[in-house]
Amino acid sequence: MKSAVENLTPTRVKLNVEVPFEELKPSIDSAYKTVASQIQVPGFRKGKVPAKLIDQRVGRGYVLETAINDGLNGWYQAAVQESGIRPLSRPEVEITEVPDPSATDGGLKFAAEVDVRPEIELPDYAGIKVEVAAAESSDADVDKALDELRGRFGTLKSVDRPAADGDFLTIDITATIDGEEVDSAAGLSYQVGAGTMLEGMDEAVTGLSADEDAIFDTTLVGGDHAGEAAQVKVAVKAVKERELPEANDDFAQLASEFDTLAELREDLAKQAAESKVVEQGVEARDKVLDKLVELVEVPVPDSVVEEQLEAHFKEGNGHGDGEHDTEEHREEVRANTARAFQNEIILDAIAEKEEVDVSQNELIDYIVTTASQYGMDPNQFAQIIDQSGQVPMMVSEVRRRKALAVVLGQATVTDSEGNAVDLSDFVRPGGEEEAPAAEVTEADTAEGEATEVPAEDEKAEAKA
């Protein structure tokens, strides 16, 4: 068998394949056996019909077609291995030449177009320079953390006054379009200033007391009329404020392992300082990755983006009722998917150059961490990803994280005040990031990996 690669674009190739008759013949012989088991000829047992009679009954052309269809994927896979290309999508195959049915020789020729991982040239990434915010925690950070802790133990009390920022309301809302009611809800709980409901809600309810209402214009975000302009009437049924427990030694004993408020504040200060270091590390990591993408040109196949785009909405990430399936959202998903693809290609190339490996313990640690983020039992989570064939994807993700950590370890990082930043607490000795913040591929989006198509999934099918 001969194969040759024709580069169509940086991310798409045409694989021209020639299969000589001697390599085609085993598939033809197998096709005769298959056809023989499917037809009945008087005087012959099923499966024992001679080839000449099969040619007379169904035609040698049908046998050749069966042989080609059965063997095509194997020849394509062999050509992929021989050429060294790394497919990203299913191939589009066109048969360009078949043996003459009236002859006993002649080869097969076909062309397969497929998207492939682009080849890139890595820059000198040692010593990349980035600047991050200074990691300074203050008494204000401690006060904020203490107030948040007090809030967990707070109680709600009805008040007879206008609603203010931070208050908790019980509300009824009714939406109308052109004077016709299109949606309504009663007894909703809402915190003023949360910004989690409708645009304009906070402004409308601020200053309202119980049994008062207001009307405001907004854009609906859910239901059959998502994205449409509407008038919304909001009626306040109750106004409540949260009473926080007094910050004293008794509260420290109630809310923590400490006996005194001073000990609790000291621990909160330590947590705030550690949090600032992690934030600094995450910022450095993201900026290093941004710099890598700036330095390397990575072409993105349209098919990869569109495939992930459709998967995103098909799997319900558009929230089921189409409320978020807007062109603006689609453009956001396209951009995120393209960026995730670029990140993957760059980090995979760095991992290959740095000969980054993933140990079993590193994979287990990552699975346990990911399981906790989903609130799942690690063993159950591991079983699910194993059954769904996602273990290789997990290995790739850990490998990329380690590759980025290698670059991060070589980067020159300073804060906004010109001080050198020590990231040793952020990067593990083995080269893996300590912080479990966002995935380095930033594929929020789900979007899945834009990696090579497994051999069993890239079956070649000829065009009709």
Swiss-Prot record:
Gene3D superfamilies recorded for this chain? 3.10.50.40, Trigger factor ribosome-binding domain, Trigger factor, C-terminal domain
Localization, per the record, is: Cytoplasm
GO BP: 'de novo' cotranslational protein folding; cell division; chaperone-mediated protein folding; protein transport; protein unfolding
Domain PPIase FKBP-type: start-end pairs = 166-245
The UniProt comment on domains reads: Consists of 3 domains; the N-terminus binds the ribosome, the middle domain has PPIase activity, while the C-terminus has intrinsic chaperone activity on its own.
Q: Which InterPro entries match?
A: PPIase_dom_sf (IPR046357), PPIase_FKBP_dom (IPR001179), Trig_fac (IPR005215), Trigger_fac_C (IPR008880), Trigger_fac_C_sf (IPR037041), Trigger_fac_ribosome-bd_bac (IPR008881), Trigger_fac_ribosome-bd_sf (IPR036611), Trigger_fact/SurA_dom_sf (IPR027304)
* NCBIfam families reported in the protein's UniProt record: tig
Alphabetized UniProt keyword annotations: Cell cycle, Cell division, Chaperone, Cytoplasm, Isomerase, Rotamase
Q: Name one GO cellular component term.
A: cytoplasm
- What's this protein's name? Trigger factor
What's the superkingdom here?
Answer: Bacteria
The principal location of this protein is cytoplasm
Composition bias of kind Acidic residues appears in 432-455
Record's function text? Involved in protein export. Acts as a chaperone by maintaining the newly synthesized protein in an open conformation. Functions as a peptidyl-prolyl cis-trans isomerase.
Which reaction equations make up its catalytic activity? [protein]-peptidylproline (omega=180) = [protein]-peptidylproline (omega=0)
Q: Where is this region: Disordered?
A: 426-464
Query: Per the similarity annotation, which family is this?
Result: Belongs to the FKBP-type PPIase family. Tig subfamily.
Q: Which GO terms describe its molecular function?
A: peptidyl-prolyl cis-trans isomerase activity; protein folding chaperone; ribosome binding
Looking up Pfam families in the UniProt record yields: FKBP_C, Trigger_C, Trigger_N
